[in-house]
Curated annotation (Swiss-Prot):
Designated name of the protein: Cytochrome b
One Pfam family of this chain: Cytochrome_B
Lineage: Eukaryota, Metazoa, Chordata, Craniata, Vertebrata
Cofactor: heme b
Location, primary (coarse class): mitochondrion
Organism of this sequence: Peromyscus truei (Pinyon mouse)
Coiled coil: none
Gene (UniProt): MT-CYB
Length: 381
């Protein structure tokens, strides 16, 4: 058996990735989120596949087909709510995974980090298109508002929006293509995940100390397989509590009303995991400026390797930057809250201050703090 595991071309890849992989002995539970994201992706693909068997991507029947899934299909309600809340769990794990990377300086693995950013954009695009499919009020108006942002692009904007819509408004053509893209993207994401892991295994994992761990590695199996299984069980427990007790807590009641182009909801807002970016978008009065700020709110992650000024990798032994990091986390919670609140005083002002703070902390304060900490430690080359 050992012979096959180590010599067979296919099993050898699996063995070198999940069994005999040398792993730092001191990685904490913050390193569990990679495997949890893998499980989330599998759950989403499987539940999505079964939903697609019963869903129809036509404006006249889409809403009814989702109702049919929930009422008439065996365990359809379970599949539907696992898919909807599975997306929320996916994003919780994603944000924690990215936060861990930012805290422990994992962005110094630039290839792995950049593929991760591409993955984040791909998952966000998939989630957005998935939200349009039930064809409720918030689906329709969310799609209208977000796709309309592309019209801010100079010269080609309007043409681009109409090209994406497949007409002069969000309609049947839009829904059909969004379903097609929503179906294919998770498989593209799976391919990107493999590339993400490929680059990670070139360098090996980071660890909480930020130091080289070559002298103290242990095999991935059984130590981290059992640790990952514990994480997976906890994830599934939280997911099933959400699905079975509070299935609609993260959704919008407006989406239980069929899409009506003649009636605009009082407050158009995306799902909770986009609210921080939506708040940044809304805090800038100019349309193009807002769109650029929206994109930069995620793309700024690509600048982290260049903004790293400290001689230490992580924030484990850097108290000043640690404080800034947790202020940034609190700031993101504030942005999430503002994104779901109406556009009126004082929310507009709070949103603008939080947006300015977000970029200032990352671009200005953290690099300065890194230099100050180096000087305080008198670490000179």
């Amino acid at each position: 058996m050992t012979n096959i595991r180590k010599k067979h071309p296919l099993f050898k890849i699996i063995n070198d990735s999940f069994i005999d992989l040398p792993t730092p002995s001191n990685i904490s539970s913050w390193w569990n989120f990679g495997s949890l994201l893998g499980i989330c992706l599998v759950i989403q693909i499987l539940t999505g596949l079964f939903l697609a068997m019963h869903y129809t991507s036509d404006t006249t029947t889409a809403f009814s087909s989702v109702t049919h899934i929930c009422r008439d299909v065996n365990y359809g309600w379970l599949i539907r709510y696992m898919h909807a809340n599975g997306a929320s769990m996916f994003f919780i794990c994603l944000f924690l995974h990215v936060g861990r990377g930012x805290y422990y300086g994992s962005y110094t693995f630039t290839e792995t980090w950049n593929i991760g950013i591409v993955l984040l954009f791909a998952v966000m695009a998939t989630a957005f298109m998935g939200y349009v499919l039930p064809w409720g009020q918030m689906s329709f108006w969310g799609a209208t508002v977000i796709t309309n942002l592309l019209s801010a692009i100079p010269y080609i904007g309007t043409t681009l929006v109409e090209w994406i819509w497949g007409g002069f408004s969000v309609d049947k053509a839009t829904l059909t293509r969004f379903f097609a893209f929503h179906f294919i993207l998770p498989f593209i994401i799976t391919a990107l995940v493999i590339v993400h892991l490929l680059f990670l295994h070139e360098t090996g994992s980071n660890n909480p100390s930020g130091l080289n761990s070559d002298a103290d590695k242990i095999p991935f199996h059984p130590y981290y397989t059992i640790k990952d299984i514990l994480g997976i069980l906890l994830l599934l427990m939280v997911l099933m509590i959400l699905v079975l007790f509070f299935p609609d807590i993260l959704g919008d009641p407006d989406n239980y009303t069929p899409a009506n182009p003649l009636n605009t909801p009082a407050h158009i807002k995306p799902e909770w995991y986009f609210l921080f970016a939506y708040a940044i978008l809304r805090s800038i009065p100019n349309k193009l400026g807002g769109v650029m700020a929206l994109i930069m709110s995620i793309l700024i992650l690509a600048l982290l390797p260049f903004l790293h000024t400290s001689k230490q990798r992580g924030l484990t032994f850097r108290p000043i930057t640690q404080v800034l990091f947790w202020i940034l986390v609190a700031n993101l919670f504030i942005l999430t809250w503002i994104g779901g609140x109406p556009v009126e005083h004082p929310f507009v002002m709070i949103g603008q201050l939080a947006s300015i703070s977000y970029f200032t902390i990352i671009i200005v304060l953290m690099p300065i703090a890194g230099m100050i900490e180096d000087n305080m430690l008198k670490i000179y080359p």
